[in-house]
């Protein structure tokens, strides 16, 4: 590229989606999957975005539905303080009993990640989706459908229009035209 010419730009787009698991219990494919994603991905990502990380965020309508569910904070806290605390404690004790102190310390460290995630959630007043709102620039199809696999053009249009409408309903007119094409 010669001097004085535009060098372009780089966009890092993070797309977030979670199949609908809210209200389906915990193990093996229920809400536990959502709680783990919140603790390990969404809440740490929110901390980065709040610090000004230059990322573009895409939220699927299905994930948004789950993040605005009633009593989200209470159910997440019950998972972290109950299930996760107990399993981490038991697993760390088992590792120590087996002579694996270094692995037990790593498990103790990872428990701290869960505590920080819960603290972050509480600091946000349980408003997971509200906290993501100012960062949500892109959307996706209504149910994260793989659009080329839909049987009709009408179905494709409905998925796209419904996804955009859901985004605008939640986040106002702040949609910037970005649309993630689901692939999985």
Where are these predicted regions, by residue range?
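Catalytic alpha-helical scaffold of carbohydrate-active enzymes acting on polysaccharides/glycoconjugates
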Residues: 1-32, 36-177, 184
């Amino acid at each position: 590229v010669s001097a004085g010419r535009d060098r372009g730009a780089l966009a890092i787009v993070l797309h977030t989606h979670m199949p609908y698991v809210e209200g389906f219990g915990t193990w093996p494919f229920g809400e536990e999957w959502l709680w783990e994603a919140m603790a390990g991905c969404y809440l740490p990502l929110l901390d980065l975005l709040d610090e000004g990380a230059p990322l573009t965020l895409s939220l699927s309508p299905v994930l948004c539905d789950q993040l605005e569910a009633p009593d989200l904070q209470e159910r997440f806290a019950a998972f972290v303080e109950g299930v996760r605390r107990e399993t981490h404690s038991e697993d760390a004790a088992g590792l120590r009993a087996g002579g694996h102190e270094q692995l037990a310390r790593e498990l103790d460290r990872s428990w701290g990640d869960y505590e920080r995630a819960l603290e972050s959630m509480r600091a946000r007043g349980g408003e997971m989706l509200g906290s993501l709102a100012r960062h949500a620039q892109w959307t996706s199809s209504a149910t994260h459908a793989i659009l080329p696999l839909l049987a009709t053009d009408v179905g494709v249009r409905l998925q796209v229009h419904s996804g955009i409408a859901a985004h605008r309903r939640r986040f106002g007119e702040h949609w910037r035209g970005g649309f993630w094409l689901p692939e999985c």
